[in-house]
């Protein structure tokens, strides 16, 4: 039957076509933070917390992982005597996000 792929051919397609997904970005919360920062370039911790509905502790851990990967910078400062944490996407973070999106698209277009 035309268009039908046998098991062996499907194995070859999956080996050849599926790109590995970045494990740092594959987390739902880290991906959400990166998606927000792609459009905003930088955002306050409180904004990210509100938009992602994450707890402070979980968000703090996840942005630390993004920082360790070099995907974001974390700037801690004071604003009117109140502590303020700003997350800023890096060029490496932009590239990683774009590569992640391309990898996902390759799964869809097979």
Regions found by a protein language model. Give the residues of each.
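N-terminal helix-turn-helix DNA-binding core of bacterial DNA-binding proteins
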Residues: 17-58, 77-80, 84-88
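Short, hydrophobic-biased segments on the C-terminal half of alpha helices
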Residues: 63-64
């Amino acid at each position: 039957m035309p268009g039908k792929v046998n098991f062996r051919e499907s194995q070859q397609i999956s080996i050849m076509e599926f790109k590995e997904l970045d494990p740092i970005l594959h987390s739902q919360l880290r991906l959400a933070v990166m998606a927000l920062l792609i459009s905003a370039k930088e955002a306050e911790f409180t904004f990210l917390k509100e938009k992602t509905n994450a707890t402070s502790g979980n968000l703090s851990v996840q942005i630390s992982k993004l920082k360790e990967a070099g995907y974001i910078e974390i700037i801690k400062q004071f604003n009117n005597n109140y502590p303020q944490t700003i997350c800023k996407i890096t060029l490496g973070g932009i590239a990683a996000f774009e590569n992640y999106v391309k990898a996902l698209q390759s799964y869809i277009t097979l």
